[in-house]
Amino acid sequence: RSLESTLQATFPGIRFSFYGINGAWARRFYEHDMISRVAAENPDLLVISFGTNEAHGSALDRQAHAKTMDLLTQRIRERCPDVCFLFTTPPGSYLSQRVYRTTRGRRRRTTVKVVNPNTPDVANSIVRYCQERQMAVWDLYTIAGGEQSACTNWRDAGLMNTDLVHFLTTGYTLQGTLLGEAICKAYEEAALPGTQTRMMHGSTPLEQKPYKSVAGF
């Protein structure tokens, strides 16, 4: 809700809808009746936030990942031809890993948390996909510190849940506020009409008019 309140503070009267499904992968949405729900709303801007669950699968297949995003955006655009897409990258997360440790001469197996090595691949795949198609992307992973420090920054700030995958309310609130501020900033800096931007990755401007409705996955 922090994204909604941040946008409404700048653009009063904007309508915001949220279609999140906890634990869902991107392909869940184009196989689901979610496309019909989005079409019924007919949003001006659709924020697509995937990546954390994809990063917890096996090694990323970049071609399959791009195909999934293509199918999703194509099926939405068939129903909403004027919609603008804004992708976001995942914030970063940890994996549980079994290791052996020797204590008092006895070898024991224990579980430790390690930074998820798949997140950079997923984030880079999303950024590359948007660059190639001139779609907007907000690179939260890089903003948070990237491969070197995104995960530790979130954890050390006390914003992550104990599973080190999900976030506390304060963490999600911060992410929503940052995204809302980025959208407002991109609009304020817009210079040319009718173009989508790679937010935080270049100066290509957004469409120079306020959005009336925003939807988010």
Where are these predicted regions, by residue range?
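Conserved SGNH/GDSL esterase-like catalytic core that processes O-acyl groups on lipids
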Residues: 1-71, 78, 94-96, 166, ...
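Extracytoplasmic/secreted proteins, especially bacterial periplasmic and envelope-associated proteins
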Residues: 2, 33, 60, 64-75, ...
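Active-site proximal loops enriched in glycine and acidic residues that flank catalytic Cys/His/Asp
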Residues: 20-23, 49-52, 87-92, 139-142, ...
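Sec-exported extracytoplasmic/periplasmic mature domains
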Residues: 8, 39, 51, 74-81, ...
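Catalytic His-Asp segment of secreted/periplasmic serine-dependent ester chemistry enzymes
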Residues: 93-217
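Extended hydrophobic-aromatic, low-complexity segments
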Residues: 57-58, 84-88, 96-99, 148-149
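Conserved, well-ordered alpha-helix/loop/beta-strand core segments that scaffold catalytic motifs
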Residues: 47-51, 73, 84-89, 124
